[in-house]
Design a protein with these regions (language model features):
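Acidic/polar low-complexity segments with low predicted structural confidence
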Residues: 1-101, 249, 255, 263
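Active-site oxyanion-binding pockets that recognize sulfate/phosphate
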Residues: 14, 108-111
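Acidic, glycine-rich A-domain
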Residues: 42-43, 69, 92-105, 112-264
Length: 264
């Protein structure tokens, strides 16, 4: 995927109109589709807990018995004399977890330094929104907030909605995220940001504490891309980590693992 080209489009789209803008939207969609195709199955498998039936499960119980595979693999052991199938090998498939509805709230910082993470976050929101047990709330923010939850399944729309410039008010965005929490223990709040707060740091800490205390899961992703090599405000990050939130950069597949473990 040509991430560099898409970053340039985002930076210059305010100068585009007509056919040029339409072409830019097509490129955004193509890049998003390419990323999704690359990540889709890996992320969904991490999140659903569904194991490939070609892989034997370590949990061997009747609920996990792969009946068809067991019969198929033991046909060679059929005893004609006794008219019985001798089961010499028993096969088990992975467990399929049952889920309550989970709410994933993703807040994306529009800062220019976060462009790569914005692109991957938009695609991740689409992938997660396609899961039957997940409900995605998606916002982008600087000093104002835009709720794109109705477009969580359209990463190109999210990407082309980004408005670079202006300040950053993470506390304000997180306060809005808090208002979207209904069942805390079934909620994960993910803020994709470099943590350079232009608003009130005290409010940021207070709201973070409230979310964690409620039982919801709070994460600050300082990078979400293939490199996961973030530049961020480490002092603020340390304070948030000390109170119990996750702070750090993740690759998309690692984010899938992380969310999967949270709701395991």
């Amino acid at each position: 995927p040509d991430i560099a080209l898409l970053k340039t489009i985002i930076q210059l789209k305010h100068l585009m109109n007509g056919e040029v803008l339409q072409a830019a939207v097509k490129i955004a969609k193509q890049v998003a589709d390419d990323i999704k195709q690359k990540l889709d199955m890996t992320i969904k498998r991490s999140l659903t807990g569904r194991l490939d039936k070609n892989t034997s499960s370590v949990t061997k119980c009747s609920a996990n018995l792969d009946f068809k595979k067991t019969i198929r693999r033991n046909l060679k052991n059929y005893d004609k004399a006794s008219n019985q199938l001798i089961l010499k090998d028993i096969y088990f498939s992975g467990r399929v977890k049952k889920h309550n509805k989970k709410r994933i709230i993703i807040a994306i910082d529009e800062s220019g330094s976060m462009l790569g993470s914005v692109i991957y976050s938009a695609v991740m929101a689409q992938i997660i929104s396609e899961l039957p047990f997940a409900e995605v709330k998606l916002i982008i923010f600087d000093t104002s907030i835009v709720d794109l939850s109705d477009h969580a399944d359209d990463p190109a729309q999210t990407i082309m909605s980004v408005q670079l410039g202006g300040g950053t008010d993470i506390a304000k965005a997180l306060t809005y995220c808090e208002s979207l929490i209904i069942t805390p223990r079934d909620t994960c709040v993910i803020v994709v940001t470099d943590l350079y707060e232009g608003g009130s740091e005290a409010q940021l800490m207070n709201v973070s504490k409230n979310i964690i205390t409620s039982g919801a899961h709070l994460s600050f992703l300082t990078a979400l891309d293939e490199n996961a090599d973030p530049a961020y405000d480490k002092a603020t990050g340390q304070k948030l980590a000390d109170m119990g939130s996750f702070v750090g950069g993740l690759t998309p597949d690692k984010l899938g693992d992380y969310i999967g473990k949270i709701f395991a």
